[in-house]
Structures are given as C-alpha cells and as structure tokens.
Amino acid sequence: FGNPPYSRASQHEGQYITGMRYIMKHASSMRDKGGRYVFLIKAATSEVWWPEDADHIAFIRGRIGFELPAWFIPKDEKQVPTGAFFAGAIAVFDKTWKGPAISYIGRDELEACGEAFLAQVRQQAEKLVREMAA
C-alpha cells in the first residue's frame, strides 16, 4: 500500500525514486510479474502519470484528511496539517482482480474499512506478542 509523493522526478544511483510517472510505471511492470499494489492517489485523470492500465480505480467521494504523528511539531503555518486540496482515488494493480474497473467509495466508508483492517492487525499483533512471550 502506498501514498506516493507528488514531488518532481529524481534519481538515486540511476533509478527513479520519485515522480508519479515512474512510480505508476514501476507498479504496472511489477503487476505484470505478479505484484499487487494499492495506491492512494490524486484523482487527476488529465495528468501524464494517470494509471490508465490499473486493474481498478475507486474514486473517493469526499476529501481525505491527513493526520501527522503526535511527535511532529510544525516549523511554521505552512506545515500545519490540512485536508487534501484535490479529489482522491485508489488505484489497484493486481492481475487477479475480478471486480469492476471503476467504482466509487465514500470517505466515511473508506475510513471505516481502514479502521476495521487496523483492528485486525492490532489483534493479530497482540496474539503474536503473547505467543512469543509464552
């Protein structure tokens, strides 16, 4: 799962590590090899990086807010967290996908799904800790 950076494309040791065009291109090529990727992206269908070849796109109804970690102290008012200023979408790269190519999901439903998933992860983590302590 990822929320890719929208920064300009840059390389490290000859490999692109940022830039949506390259991130989406890499996800697509890894999908062809069996990789499964889910990205929270800007719903910007006119951008050159828009993932036309994604197996599923879910457009999000409602803006998504971003919460910073409790330890983060904004340097100035430019770093104060706000909601996204653009519409969002979820791009799925998974060649085993059997659902529709396009769908819509409300922000509240998406957040509820995320909370349910996190509850399952926490439950399994607690179980693992107990087993390791025994």
Regions found by a protein language model. Name each.
Residues F1-A134:
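Class I S-adenosyl-L-methionine-dependent methyltransferase catalytic core
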